[in-house]
Amino acid sequence: MGLNISKEQEERIMSNVPYNHKAIEKKWRERWEQNPVNLKADEKGNKREKYYCLDMFPYPSGNGLHVGHWRGYVISDVWSRYKLQQGYYIVHPMGWDAFGLPAENYAIKMGVHPAISTAENVKNIKRQINEIAALYDWDMEVNTTDPEFYKWTQWIFVKMFKEGLAYEKEFPINWCPSCKTGLANEEVVNGKCERCGTEVTKKNLRQWMLRITKYAERLLSDLDKLDWPEKVKKMQADWIGKSYGAEVDFPIEGREEKITVYTTRPDTLYGATFMVLAPEHELSKSLATDETREAVEKYIYDASMKSNVDRMQDKEKTGVFTGSYAINPLNGEKTPIWLSDYVLADYGTGAIMCVPAHDDRDFEFATKFGIPIVQVIAKDGKEIENMTEAYTEAAGNMINSGEWNGMESAVLKKEAPHIIEKRGLGRATVNYKLRDWVFSRQRYWGEPIPIVHCPDCGAVPVPEEELPLRLPEVESYEPTGTGESPLAGIDEWVNCKCPVCGKPAKRETNTMPQWAGSSWYFLRYVDNHNDKELVSREKADEMLPVDMYIGGVEHAVLHLLYSRFYTKFLYDIGAIDFDEPFHKLFNQGMITGKNGIKMSKSKGNVVSPDDLVRDYGCDSLRMYELFVGPPELDAEWDDRGIDGVNRFLKRLWNLVMDSKDADVKATKDMIKERHRLVYDITTRLESFSLNTAISGFMEHNNKLIEIAKKEGAIDKETLSTMAVLLSPFAPHIAEEIWEQLGHEGSVFAAGWPTYDMEAMKDDEIEVPVQINGKTRAVISVAADISKEDAIAEGKEAVADKLTGTIVKEIYVPKKIINIVMK
């Protein structure tokens, strides 16, 4: 990166020429390599308290890093270095989320085996990440494709299997025709594959599932423990989707079976004039009569070809009458049973009771198919004649509801589940929208699922002592599209012996999703060479859990939810002693190209950091990444903006070079500016207002330059304070300034400075003097001047303009003097 010069030449260059980012950054990279600044103990040997700051580790994409990726890494490093200055030992690791669809799709596109392309991509991105000059501890590095890492990913799965949390199920799943694999609900966005954007369809497949629903209540209630953005907590709460209601049993006319529905409004049961089943409901086909069978079977087939999102979209509802009836358990009325694809088999019971008078969707359906509409809630008890839309107001009194007539609906809503349960018609129930996690993928590039299928013993886990079950090397790794993983074609790997009975058996050929390793990787960083346990209790106690997690909000209901689930499970089995992975979360916004368009190679708007580092230096780019806008919001990139930041660093450098040999004592103005500088940068850093921290440096530097013009130079303590404050943002130049000012050792051993509010106060302030609201003069007065003295001095300043009668004299402290005349 730098110049081939001696240390003596280097020192001479630094002291006598303008800001030279190449020489400075080369010098301090080498110095940090020899003398690391992030130490577990202080100079006296006292152990430092840890602070674990974590980035969401990257997919090793073939496109490398662009300036948008840099933003998150710079934010985390600024925070890490700030905590280092506060005296913490910083746990700040980095690794690679290298299994899964992104890596495999890139390998297929390039015609290279994913093991080769992934290794090449890791090497390139690691080089780019090192250009950031972050505090990453590469001794902690992990890679999800390393067998010594995924041994423990498989170990977690085996533990879940033994605890009954991992199970097999055959059912229609989300299927991406392009990626040729199943997808979890969380990986489908607006009906499209989260990775490639292809329309998602349905495919009936045998799948491995994780029973995340067992943790639904804890995942929801424990959100209150977390110092996370409210937006993310709400997204998770909505995804978990807790609701209170009742399961109600509807007997089927002429049959012994009952259809159980889940409803959050059991108070409206008298108004249920029909019911709708999901086409996949286990009774759907058998409910068809001879007259309806052909139409029912066609409808079931058509529904199976649609994604859940397509089925739930707000468009015209479709349906088919089965020909069968249920009996409303409260009033004994016959209730026609319909099928419609807007009801999903995996929510509730896969069947709903429909109250068209009080639900827009049910009203639309009933109107279309000529089904009776019975109003059971009315405002002031008055029934609506000729309803043209559903009455969906929450408040009202019950009508047409037998013994419930006259009751307030809000009261009955709470009581009805218990009334229904007491009468043996159903059960009071809590329900969740959260579904079990579809965990298997029909791809090659993923962790093999450590299960053996035995004809006699069934599904048997690979013994823990035999882990890792290594992914076999293959020539053909492209997805088959048949619902079988490419591993299914490797007979010598598939065929094995049952670990229990020793008879011939077959290995599971599906692999784990890309989320498997990322759900727990943050634990492995701190004990990544331990081959005996996932993480030792000693290391866990010393460095876990994560104090600050920084990454994009796009993972709110994927990685962040899965990580919480994994952490709670590992806590339950005693592997760790905490049940939430990340104390604090910060979501940075995206850096976009022109007109707010997401950066991508296909759009040709990717900005590589490499050239900017070469031309302006790492420090300038780091500061500009923060300066582009509030870190939590998206920001549009403009290369021209880096000039302003670079200009600030040059002006600061020149100020230091002009002052470092001057024998200047701190004036009141210097001391005041020093304390204001500390206050502004500290408060802005603490509030994560990093863009205003950068502008704060510029503002205060300009003020110091003005003071230097008057006093000849700036005192060393003020400039040293500037270096310490700047060190998290621009570490190279901060180190160099610190050394140029005569300090020994690293600036990162200095400790974060404090401020004194008294020292920040002005001795004198300028106050405008107004007559009838118009400014006539500006005077300098003591900051603590009394009202009487301020008005007296103000009147003196405008004495020649006081030509009328004074009716009022106003002094707003430190703001304004106003004399009202007539």
Per-segment meaning from a language model:
Residues S76, Y89, H281-D380, E385, ...:
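Catalytic alpha/beta core of large soluble enzyme barrels
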Residues S324-L330, K334-Y347, V376, V494-P631:
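Alpha-helical recognition segments enriched in aromatics with Gly/Pro capping
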Residues R12-L54, L84-P93, S117-N124, W228, ...:
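Conserved oxyanion/phosphate-binding beta-strand-loop segments in alpha/beta enzyme cores
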Residues D42-V112, T118, E141-I156, C179, ...:
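N-terminal catalytic cores of NTP/NDP-binding nucleotidyl/phosphoryl-transfer enzymes
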Residues G2-R48, A278-H281, D290-R293, I371-G381, ...:
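Basic, alpha-helical terminal appendages of large translation-related enzymes
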Residues G2-E11, P18, K26-K27, R31-L39, ...:
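Residue patterns forming the tRNA-binding/recognition surfaces of aminoacyl-tRNA synthetases
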Residues T213, R218-K242, A278-V320, E465-K497, ...:
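Amphipathic alpha-helical
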Residues D97, K162-C176, A428-A459, Q514, ...:
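Helix-rich, typically C-terminal accessory recognition domains appended to large enzymatic cores
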